[in-house]
Amino acid sequence: MKPAARRRARECAVQALYSWQLSKNDIADVEHQFLSEQDVKDVDITYFRELLAGVATQAEKLDQLMAPFLSRQIEELGQVEKAILRLAMFELSKREDVPYKVAINEAIELAKVFGAEDSHKFVNGVLDKAAPSVRKGKK
């Protein structure tokens, strides 16, 4: 699958995760609604589904994994930043086929598009500190 299709999958996953975090609806319902309402023709749907399901089912573990690297409590994070960081932590911890630099860069780009003005700097700082611990030296 093309890298652009994976990037689009991440973009869609962040949007769907944001919706899920706010609505607290079942993730399968969020996925169905998202796929029926959004243009997903250039999206790696398989990867989108994996990211969405993986983050949703492991959100608590992902939060625990990132907590030591945050400068504030998870509850104080904006919903967009939380969705982006959860997605990146999922890729870092569960998708070793994705190089850690790619996971970090993609998260930074997502924060630039969807986050507040300086959220990309915050995301970069958290993931730069977290990646060596999560990947245990693997590139």
From Swiss-Prot:
Pfam family, one: NusB
Biological process per Gene Ontology, one example term: DNA-templated transcription termination
Keyword Transcription regulation belongs to the record: yes
Protein origin, superkingdom: Bacteria
Gene Ontology cellular-component terms listed: cytosol
Alphabetized CDD domains for the sequence: Terminator_NusB
Disulfide bond residue pairs: none
Keywords for the protein's UniProt record, in alphabetical order: RNA-binding, Transcription, Transcription antitermination, Transcription regulation
Molecular-function annotations in GO: RNA binding
Protein family membership: Belongs to the NusB family.
Record's function text: Involved in transcription antitermination. Required for transcription of ribosomal RNA (rRNA) genes. Binds specifically to the boxA antiterminator sequence of the ribosomal RNA (rrn) operons.
Protein name as annotated: Transcription antitermination protein NusB
